[in-house]
């Protein structure tokens, strides 16, 4: 099926009229030693989702290149189609988005529950249609996500914004420029306010703005569509609004996924391997590669690649922080790596309070990890052993993949669909580096009413 979002994580299949089976993907990984080789890095999911939402701001086509073929992209495309956007995938890595006419201003829970990125539609839809109703999103349960800053920023721009028990609703006859100070440099909040500000009247200043690479990517796209924005990549972004006039079409090449690159580098380091990740910006990953060097790895950066040669690992401490600090999306992977390092490492999570969901599964594999508040204390090195584990979210799944690659025996990972939401061609890329990985689809009896975000079919 061409649209990755059209394939649900579990699909109901009718058998003999009365018996329903639920198909579930398992990832089976056998630890086979060091990874070696070169892996090309896919386009950034975190850049693709806001850029896709930005298509609502133009009445001409937006052509995207280097888009990863993952589940969340298909879900975003489905939401855009619901709003009346022409969303097509003409070829690998490409999307054609044309919002000539916005035909709806609401996105229901049947779509938004599948991922957190649905909230990115709020600012763009409000700016284009004058109203937006977005059912409260789903996605990874990694803790509180501060939505109030999005809403308050839109209110400062003149919108009437309410939060019901099930949705965020915003209306504005016209948006006006405002000076918005973010208490915390929220990435999604910065992106939402940027998109709303492009069509507002007057100048909007966003202070304490997020500086993540995908925010910069969104600004590049918006400027290519005719927006007037300065300060991207800094804490102060200035947007000169177009007074309601839509943006024009553009061709935009997405940046590569530094989180994917960091995941493969951590896997190579954990297995004692030597790999090159190519087609990415090493500067996006600098806080992570600096920690790898501190842990003993040999890391060399090129213009568009990073080469790592593993060495005996020693424990280092790490605290997540907004960019250019250590990315929270790489914290679970680094924690898995530290199970193979000599000594005690303290992994602290400053951004989300529920981002250690992988730890119980790592313990099942033999890891010695204690949780104290927002920190994980990792004692290493540990001889991990393969067993059955469950993937709770995307990045926790990546941590479990790393653990499985350096474990003795075979690990079976239930909930592999989480990995499909964030990693393109995961098995194929791991196999190219010498890993033993296979996907197993099993069928288990289930009830028709169980919610797997799936479909009932014959």
Segments predicted by a language model, with ranges:
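Structural preference for solvent-exposed beta-strand-turn elements
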Residues: 15-458
